[in-house]
Amino acid sequence: MEVIPNINSRRAGLIARIKLIVRGDLTTGNYDPVLAESFSGCIPTRSAFQFSGADGVESAFPVEYVMRMMNDWAKGECNPYIKIQNTGVSVLIEGFFDPPINATKAPLCTDKVNVLLNTTESTGIVLSDINKIKQSIGVDCRPFQACLIVNCFVRLPIVQLAFRFVGPSDPGRTTKLLDSAIAAYDAKIRQRRKRNLQIMESKSQDHTSDGCIPIPIIDETHRSGITGESKSLFGMFKNIASGECVTTIRIPRYIVMLWIFSVLLAMVTWGSYRLYS
């Protein structure tokens, strides 16, 4: 049976995915074991991984791409930081999920994209600063349009760093892929809303089947269709119920006397019948 990967399985093996995009002339150093597993809610507080390059190495490190992978693995609960240091014998690249105390940052701007590191000196870049840098130097901030990389030229005792924004090799194809991803996301949202609406309708039908029948409400259109006679009849019942309507019946006096005499005659006749029987 084929197992469909979920979001947790896609986030697993972060260190392996980072190794796939880092060039082979950079040696993998120590890394936190949790990077080989799915995110468990615990973010490493110290150096998460290390890469190093010996004297004479000329290599490019995808700074922004790696930090965005780290942010995705941690479900956005971090602000990744990449530290680059000249150790005196090599260049050391370290990844942190949050900037450490007194973390140095590269002063990147339009006129300055190169940094020279002497022995024991270091610099770095934070993910949250990348969009600010893009805006300041006029780089396209849309996803997949420009990605920050750093070229390391190790010439001990000096390490030269050159920060560059590189775009896709085929901008048209990248734009189409981005548009299709946005369309797929919108379709997923619409499907989720439709499913929630169906669930709500089924719940309302269940309440109706249990005996909870909604009371119909007469709108103004139906109310206007009531005739004048019906309105007067309703008004009379309303007045009677509220005690506002008092009816007086006038009966002639002779009819009253005749009715009393008939009652007395019936009583005398019934008494005589009982006495002689």
Curated annotation (Swiss-Prot):
UniProt cross-references to InterPro entries, sorted A to Z: Herpesvirus_viron_egress-type
Nuclear compartment spans: 272-277
Top-level taxon: Viruses
Positions of transmembrane segments: 251-271
Pfam families per UniProt: Herpes_U34
Keyword Membrane: yes
Keywords: Host membrane, Host nucleus, Late protein, Membrane, Phosphoprotein, Transmembrane, Transmembrane helix
Perinuclear space topological intervals: 1-250
GO cellular component: host cell nuclear inner membrane; membrane
Subcellular localization(s) per the UniProt record: Host nucleus inner membrane
Membrane topology note: Single-pass membrane protein
Post-translational modification: Phosphorylated.
Name the record gives this protein: Nuclear egress protein 2
Function: Plays an essential role in virion nuclear egress, the first step of virion release from infected cell. Within the host nucleus, NEC1 interacts with the newly formed capsid through the vertexes and directs it to the inner nuclear membrane by associating with NEC2. Induces the budding of the capsid at the inner nuclear membrane as well as its envelopment into the perinuclear space.
Known partners and oligomeric status: Forms a heterohexameric complex with NEC1.
Family statement drawn from the similarity comment of this UniProt entry: Belongs to the herpesviridae NEC2 protein family.
